């Protein structure tokens, strides 16, 4: 049986019903990218679609990113967890969506972080300052330890996704399903997320590099800190969001969405014995690409067609924060009040109000600014297919129409 067949069998085992109607602590990751025009220049391939960019990048590193953590996903322990997850089919628990996304990578590309780590490892190549590094085993231009790091990065990210799929029982409504189903799903989410983190910690220890352990440990700490800040700043429906500026937003976003990729890219350079300058450029690429990607995701409700106008959006997203910053706190609160209808916030009306201001265009400019910073960091790496693929990823996340 092929690896693809194994993955499809696992997805079928988890059930084929649609996604749950409501998520609680689940967040959008580096998954959904729009395709539109670029600004700074074009890569040699000038990619038009996100899936095309990812597919070409996977060919360069040797295998699809969705297979990177396959050894963990097909372990006996996780097979037992999958049997328990199957019991959640039909309950609408967010854990089901995460599980399906892990095996249906064609649409969601949850494992982008590991792919970027492999690409930047190949783009940098072996270190010229340490001859001992030349003796390490290398496949498709990437050391085995760097491939292990890519898997570890994905395990950490996936564990966070699973943990953030926990249902907030205090906000549970009768329409969400029986309480016992949600409690059971929460237990499985906690245990399976902990299992993935344990595998990541074991993999880190096997790398036998204390600096890499320190980098990934600090990235995990940043993630937890960032998620805590997001949960503290998150607002219930129809309530006034916190008063934060774009500088504070960027600090929080770095912790929750950028730190893992940035420090994993730096760790990949450390494993290949590159000097501090190369490590810093890898860090800067990961940081700014992830930041640009997050802003792109925040912009989607404001640049898509009217089919999505009825949907809600995050009142602490980049375009909204910038809109409030330009407008002033008092006028922003007034606009929220004007968008209230029968005790409920009319997101369609508020969206049009925000689109009429400067927040959306400023967010697009900010997205492109960070994209430019990511491209500048890549200039320190020699020209190669891997570097072009990294550039294509930046072009894809900074294109709008």
From Swiss-Prot:
- Quote the subcellular location field of this record: Mitochondrion
Q: Which UniProt keywords apply?
A: Isoprene biosynthesis, Lipid metabolism, Mitochondrion, Transferase, Ubiquinone biosynthesis
Q: What does this protein do?
A: Heterotetrameric enzyme that catalyzes the condensation of farnesyl diphosphate (FPP), which acts as a primer, and isopentenyl diphosphate (IPP) to produce prenyl diphosphates of varying chain lengths and participates in the determination of the side chain of ubiquinone. Supplies nona and decaprenyl diphosphate, the precursors for the side chain of the isoprenoid quinones ubiquinone-9 (Q9) and ubiquinone-10 (Q10) respectively. The enzyme adds isopentenyl diphosphate molecules sequentially to farnesyl diphosphate with trans stereochemistry. May play a role during cerebellar development.
By sequence similarity, the record places it as follows: Belongs to the FPP/GGPP synthase family.
Organism lineage: Eukaryota, Metazoa, Chordata, Craniata, Vertebrata
Q: Per UniProt, what is the name of the gene that codes for the protein in this document?
A: Pdss2
Which GO molecular function terms does the record list? all-trans-decaprenyl-diphosphate synthase activity; protein heterodimerization activity
Q: Which residues, if any, are the signal sequence?
A: none
Which species does this protein come from? Mus musculus (Mouse)
Q: What is this protein called?
A: All trans-polyprenyl-diphosphate synthase PDSS2
């Amino acid at each position: 049986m092929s690896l693809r067949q194994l993955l499809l069998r696992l997805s079928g085992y988890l059930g084929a019903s649609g996604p749950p109607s409501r998520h609680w602590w689940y967040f959008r990751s580096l998954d959904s990218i729009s395709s539109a025009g670029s600004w700074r220049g074009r890569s040699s391939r000038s990619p038009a679609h996100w899936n095309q960019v990812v597919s070409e990048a996977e060919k360069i590193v040797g295998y699809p990113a969705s297979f990177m953590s396959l050894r963990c996903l097909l372990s006996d322990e996780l097979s037992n967890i999958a049997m328990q997850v199957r019991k959640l089919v039909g309950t609408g628990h967010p854990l089901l969506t995460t599980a399906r996304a892990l095996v249906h990578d064609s649409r969601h590309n949850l494992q982008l972080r590991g792919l970027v780590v492999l690409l930047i490892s190949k783009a940098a190549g072996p270190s010229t300052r340490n001859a001992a590094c030349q003796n390490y085993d290398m496949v498709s231009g990437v050391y085995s330890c760097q491939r292990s790091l890519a898997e570890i990065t994905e395990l950490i990210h996936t564990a966070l996704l699973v943990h953030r799929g926990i249902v907030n029982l205090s906000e549970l409504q009768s329409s969400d399903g029986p309480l016992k189903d949600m409690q059971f799903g929460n237990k499985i989410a906690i245990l399976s997320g902990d299992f993935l983190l344990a595998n990541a910690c074991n993999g880190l220890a096997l790398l036998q590099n204390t600096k890499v352990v320190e980098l990934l440990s600090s990235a995990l700490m940043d993630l937890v800190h960032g998620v805590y800040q997001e949960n503290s700043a998150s607002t219930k429906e129809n309530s006034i969001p916190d008063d934060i500026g774009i500088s504070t937003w960027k600090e929080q976003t770095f912790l929750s969405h950028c730190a893992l990729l940035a420090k994993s890219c730096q760790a990949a350079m450390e494993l290949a014995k590159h000097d501090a300058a190369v490590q810093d450029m890898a860090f800067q690429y990961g940081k700014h690409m992830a930041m640009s990607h997050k802003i792109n995701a925040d912009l989607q409700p404001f640049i898509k067609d009217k089919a999505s106008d009825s949907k809600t959006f995050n009142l602490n997203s980049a375009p909204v924060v910038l809109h409030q910053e330009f407008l002033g706190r008092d006028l922003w609160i007034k606009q929220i009040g004007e968008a209230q209808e029968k005790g409920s916030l009319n997101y369609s009306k508020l969206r049009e109000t925000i689109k009429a201001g400067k927040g959306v265009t400023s967010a697009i400019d900010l997205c492109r600014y960070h994209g430019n910073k990511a491209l500048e960091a890549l200039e320190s790496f020699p020209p190669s297919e891997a570097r072009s693929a990294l550039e294509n990823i930046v072009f894809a996340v900074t294109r709008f129409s």
